[in-house]
Amino acid sequence: MAKPTRKRRVKKNIESGIAHIHATFNNTIVMITDVHGNAIAWSSAGALGFKGSRKSTPFAAQMASEAAAKSAQEHGLKTVEVTVKGPGSGRESAIRALAAAGLEVTAIRDVTPVPHNGARPPKRRRV
């Protein structure tokens, strides 16, 4: 039987892009796209092996940001605009990690969706 051919990853030469940070209460997902929204690199706390409540920590968000930035820099990325969505604890540390990884952060935008009194929120937890 013939070996399945593996598709070679094409190295894209992209100078600037957008880093989308989705910080939920349970996880942090970092996706880096070009200006048109095509994905270049992504990472998340769960994909790096953090499980359970450790996924929601700022440290896990920092590691996810570093991994995504490293992968994006292989495609020639140098500057990013950051869009942050969600109320999670990894918002600040993810942005700092992108800058520390060598990407120049040009703008930070908060795009957290705010309902105009839409769906009823979940009931309060009693622990």
From Swiss-Prot:
One Pfam entry name: Ribosomal_S11
InterPro entries assigned: Ribosomal_uS11 (IPR001971), Ribosomal_uS11_bac-type (IPR019981), Ribosomal_uS11_CS (IPR018102), Ribosomal_uS11_sf (IPR036967)
Source species, domain of life: Bacteria
GO CC terms in record: ribonucleoprotein complex; ribosome
Entries under Gene3D superfamilies matching the protein: Ribosomal protein S11
UniProt keyword terms in alphabetical order: Ribonucleoprotein, Ribosomal protein, RNA-binding, rRNA-binding
GO biological process: translation
Disulfide bonds: none
Molecular function via GO: rRNA binding; structural constituent of ribosome
Tagged with keyword rRNA-binding: yes
SUPFAM superfamilies for the chain: Translational machinery components
Quaternary context: Part of the 30S ribosomal subunit. Interacts with proteins S7 and S18. Binds to IF-3.
HAMAP family: Ribosomal_uS11 (MF_01310)
Family from the record: Belongs to the universal ribosomal protein uS11 family.
Protein function: Located on the platform of the 30S subunit, it bridges several disparate RNA helices of the 16S rRNA. Forms part of the Shine-Dalgarno cleft in the 70S ribosome.
Protein's UniProt name: Small ribosomal subunit protein uS11
Taxonomic source organism: Streptococcus suis (strain 05ZYH33)
